[in-house]
């Protein structure tokens, strides 16, 4: 008999998604709903530092490579399971919108947190 928990759709926690987007949007906010967080600026670093701390607080292993790319890893399927990577960026175009890149980062975290909340046992990390 199939595991109904594994096969049933799980919804992303909209409250979590909104809260994380609100927080990351503080870094470089123009105050009028816009965002200015170009790469390698203090606002970009602050957003990266916040996101790294957010992942660590949720039990992820956080790595930063030689050029500053930020990686979060959590083992949900065992040490030998294949890995799925989700990527985006926390910097923005000058005067880009609040969803410029950051939404992909935040949505990836929220998706993985959905697996954890729903006790889904994925076949990959």
Task: Please describe what each predicted stretch is.
Residues 21, 25-28, 32, 58-59, ...:
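Structural signal for hydrophobic packing residues in well-ordered secondary-structure cores
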Residues 9, 39-40, 100:
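A generic structural signal for short
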Residues 1-31:
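N-terminal hydrophobic or amphipathic helices/low-complexity stretches enriched
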Residues 13-20, 43, 47-51, 82, ...:
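General structural feature for long, well-ordered alpha-helical segments within catalytic domains
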Residues 5, 32-36, 93-96:
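Short amphipathic alpha-helical segments at helix-loop
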Residues 29-75:
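A non-catalytic alpha/beta surface segment that caps or lines the substrate-entry region
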């Amino acid at each position: 008999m199939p595991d109904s928990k594994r096969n049933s759709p799980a919804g992303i926690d909209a409250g979590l998604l909104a809260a994380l987007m609100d927080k990351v949007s503080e870094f470089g906010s123009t105050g009028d709903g816009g965002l200015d967080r170009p790469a390698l600026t203090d606002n970009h670093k602050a957003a990266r530092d916040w996101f790294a701390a957010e992942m660590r607080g949720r039990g992820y292993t956080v790595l930063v490579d030689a050029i500053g790319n930020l990686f979060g890893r959590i083992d949900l399927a065992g040490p030998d399971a294949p890995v799925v990577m989700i990527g985006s960026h926390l910097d923005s175009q000058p005067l880009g919108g609040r969803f410029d890149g950051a939404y992909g980062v935040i949505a990836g975290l929220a998706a993985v947190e959905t697996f954890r909340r729903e006790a889904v046992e994925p076949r990959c990390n």
